[in-house]
């Protein structure tokens, strides 16, 4: 069973105080190929839709990716940038930039159905990991979207070679200064709002020693929030799955029920306007207390005491436990916190799809 518009709409009614709202009447069978993917958006009491919510029409079964795209739409700084730069992007922008601009303009019309086909087809053309054999990989498309929008919009290319600073007599201060220089020449609206780089302690391929190197920008953002599990203090980014272009160069934290291990030592260099936290779905096997996850959904604070407000989430469609297969609804309260309708019961899961993690979006509070 997959989540349906009526399930989601009932959640919205609940989080808005059970107000009397006319239900959505959608015949799913008659719209099998255009099943609505409703947006994750701020729902205000005075503008709750009476009959329907504008959203993205589904494309090749990719409602999960559509919810990610709608989260990006509600990152107002990014959306406003594309709207203000519309003419310039049309004239000088790359293929992906223009496709993303098209999506924003469609969503801006607030129509019932919006087609993300142009953007999704562009991703399909150039991202080898987007459509995998046997299913889609929306997480790969998310990384590709951020990385390549950055590459198309940045002022100049990053002049960086890992081997330049990866050697036996590595000078960490020089490595840091080289990163700062590269950072100045590698800015775009994407890097300013989303990407921070990390100084990563990693094994050198040449000398086999561990050194601090500058991690490339195709790593998605992480957060250093902490929360309590069963008598354990766990760093949230221990649960993050890193994705690299090269399938052989990927990192998934090795964890068990007794102890959480992290391969990399991380250091924040700068603070972004937005956080994107990717939780590997396998964390549900580690006896995480999900009430803590719900608490974190309202806001989070990083190690520098900068507070971020939750603005959206993209959650997996379904899961299977001892009682059968259930759906997780995607929606938000008027205050901006997320409703994880079935998340707590996921301790009973038996079969977990590896493609769809939980992706949470936060915006820095003023």
Indicate where each model-derived feature is located.
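USP/UBP deubiquitinase core
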Residues: 2-5, 12-168, 276-277, 361-365
């Amino acid at each position: 069973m997959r989540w349906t518009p009526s399930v989601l709409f009932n959640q919205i009614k609940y989080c808005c105080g059970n107000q009397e709202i006319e239900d959505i009447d959608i015949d799913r069978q008659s719209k099998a190929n255009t099943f609505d993917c409703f947006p994750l958006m701020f729902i205000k009491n005075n503008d709750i839709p009476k009959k329907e919510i504008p959203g993205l029409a589904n494309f090749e079964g990719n409602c999960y990716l559509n919810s990610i795209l709608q989260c990006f739409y509600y990152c107002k700084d990014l959306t406003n940038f594309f709207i203000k730069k519309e003419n310039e992007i049309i004239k000088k922008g790359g293929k992906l930039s223009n496709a993303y601009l098209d999506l924003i303009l469609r969503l801006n019309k607030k129509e019932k159905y919006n087609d993300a086909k142009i953007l999704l087809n562009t991703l399909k053309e150039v991202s080898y990991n987007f459509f995998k054999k046997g299913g889609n990989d929306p997480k790969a498309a998310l990384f590709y979207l951020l990385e390549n929008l950055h590459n198309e919009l940045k002022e100049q290319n990053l002049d960086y070679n890992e081997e330049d600073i990866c050697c036996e007599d590595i000078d960490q201060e020089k490595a840091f200064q080289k990163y700062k220089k590269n950072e100045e020449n590698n800015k775009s609206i994407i890097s300013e709002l989303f990407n921070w780089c990390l100084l990563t302690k990693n094994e050198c391929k040449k000398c086999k020693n561990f050194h601090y190197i500058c991690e490339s920008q195709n790593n998605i953002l992480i957060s250093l929030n902490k929360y309590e599990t069963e008598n354990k203090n766990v760093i949230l980014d221990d649960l993050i799955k890193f994705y690299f272009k090269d399938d052989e160069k990927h990192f998934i934290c090795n964890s068990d029920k007794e102890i959480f291990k992290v391969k990399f030592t991380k250091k924040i260099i700068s603070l972004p306007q937005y956080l994107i936290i990717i939780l590997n779905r396998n964390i549900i096997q580690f006896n995480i207390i999900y009430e803590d996850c719900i608490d974190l959904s309202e806001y989070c604070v990083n190690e520098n005491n900068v507070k971020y407000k939750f603005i959206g989430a993209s959650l997996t469609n379904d899961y299977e436990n001892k009682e059968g297969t259930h759906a997780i609804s995607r929606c938000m309260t008027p205050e901006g916190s997320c409703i994880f309708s079935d998340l707590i019961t996921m301790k009973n899961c038996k079969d977990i799809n590896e493609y769809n993690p939980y992706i949470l979006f936060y915006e820095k509070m003023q």
